[in-house]
A protein has these predicted regions:
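Carbohydrate-active catalytic/glycan-binding domains of CAZyme proteins
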Residues: 1-120
């Protein structure tokens, strides 16, 4: 069996992370070039992620924690909740990266609200 592979799957994205949910939906998140937000895409196939619309789930703070270098998000589904783990820093110390968590308690992470859970 041969599979056509698109390289890259999604342009200008670093630290890609793909999760396949129990319903067969694939979710894609990655660092964006501006390092200022967390985006999510969903599709029924991995190839479909390339054309799926990116939805912004969260934007960086203007100052203080989570205000700079939003980096390497991962999406997970744990015990009925959606979680995104990502790295972020303070605009005054961009290399003091720390891990943070976003949570969605709804069933659809593309439409239901996300909330900040803070630093891990």
């Amino acid at each position: 069996m041969s599979v056509d592979v698109v390289k890259p799957l999604i342009e200008q994205r670093a630290d890609p992370y793909i999760y396949k949910h129990t319903d067969g939906t694939y979710y894609f998140t990655a660092s964006v070039p501006e390092y200022d937000r967390v985006e999510l895409r969903a599709a029924k196939t991995i190839a479909g992620l390339a054309e799926a619309e990116a939805k912004v789930l969260w934007r960086k703070h203007e100052k203080g924690i989570m205000s700079q270098h939003i980096w390497a998000p991962e999406i997970h589904y744990v015990e009925g909740g959606w979680y995104i783990y990502f790295a972020a820093s303070d605009v005054d110390d961009i290399w003091a990266l720390r891990p943070y968590v976003l949570r969605c308690t709804g069933s659809d992470p593309m439409v239901d609200p996300w909330e900040e859970m803070g630093q891990m």
